């Protein structure tokens, strides 16, 4: 779904809920962005979690998952725009779903906030600028602050829409220049994301059928 489209009401009709990113934050109001309703999105996420569905949040989506479960989003120590390594924690290294990630993996980033943590949350990966890059909130509920779904085409669109932001952030240590963003190879992280999703859905089917 996209701007102004209705959130799914029949959770039983879906198997997986993926909540993507955007320029907003969980604190953005409807007055500031009429097409975005954080409370309604969190309610939808809560229904999916209660129904034991697969739930994955990406960037803003990860922050909304955290908010739904009681973990308040925060500003990241560093703004990150570009392709930088994430480093798996011991929990991440021991999680078979991330077996192809190795100790570290270069992935996409475009954020200045990060998801909140709950008492049950486990940090799977962190980066040089953000201590909460991948979070397992509970079985089959994950938050990815990073963007492993980036492709050159996606990044080109983001660059075209974010010239002012990129110019204002150019001096920051975890913000790469446009030329670098557009010439990065995003295929390895894409393949690792596919492997994670395949492994996750296989395990979900094994435990729910």
Task: Label the predicted regions.
Residues 69-153:
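Pocket-forming structural segment of enzyme catalytic cores
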Residues 22-23, 62, 112, 148:
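Active-site metal-binding loops of divalent metal-dependent hydrolases
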Residues 11-12, 137, 154-158:
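Short aromatic-enriched loop/helix-cap "lid" or pocket-rim segments at secondary-structure transitions
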Residues 33-37, 73-74, 126, 160-162:
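Glycine-rich, phosphate-binding/catalytic loops in enzymes
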Residues 42-46, 98, 194-197:
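Short amphipathic alpha-helical segments and helix-helix/interface helices
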Residues 148-209:
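Acyltransferase
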Residues 1-56:
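Flexible gly/pro-rich beta->alpha loop and the following alpha-helix that scaffold active-site loops
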């Amino acid at each position: 779904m996209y701007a102004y489209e209705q959130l799914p009401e029949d959770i039983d009709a879906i198997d997986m809920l993926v909540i993507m990113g955007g320029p907003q934050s969980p604190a953005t109001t409807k007055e500031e962005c009429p097409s975005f309703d954080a409370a309604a999105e969190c309610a939808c996420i809560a229904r999916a979690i209660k129904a034991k569905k697969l739930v994955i949040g990406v960037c803003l989506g990860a922050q909304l998952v955290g908010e739904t479960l009681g973990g308040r989003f925060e500003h990241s120590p560093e703004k990150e725009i570009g392709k930088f390594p994430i480093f798996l924690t011991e929990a991440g290294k021991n999680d078979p779903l991330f077996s192809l990630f190795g100790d570290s993996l270069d992935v996409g980033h475009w954020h200045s906030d990060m998801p909140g943590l709950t008492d049950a949350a486990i940090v799977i990966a962190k980066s040089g600028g953000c201590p909460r890059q991948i979070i397992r909130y509970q079985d089959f509920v994950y938050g990815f602050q990073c963007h492993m779904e980036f492709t050159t085409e996606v990044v080109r669109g983001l660059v075209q829409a974010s010239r002012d932001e990129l110019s204002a952030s150019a001096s920051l240590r975890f913000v790469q220049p446009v030329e670098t963003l557009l010439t990065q190879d995003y295929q390895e992280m894409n393949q690792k994301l596919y492997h994670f999703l395949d492994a996750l859905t296989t395990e979900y089917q094994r435990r729910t059928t």
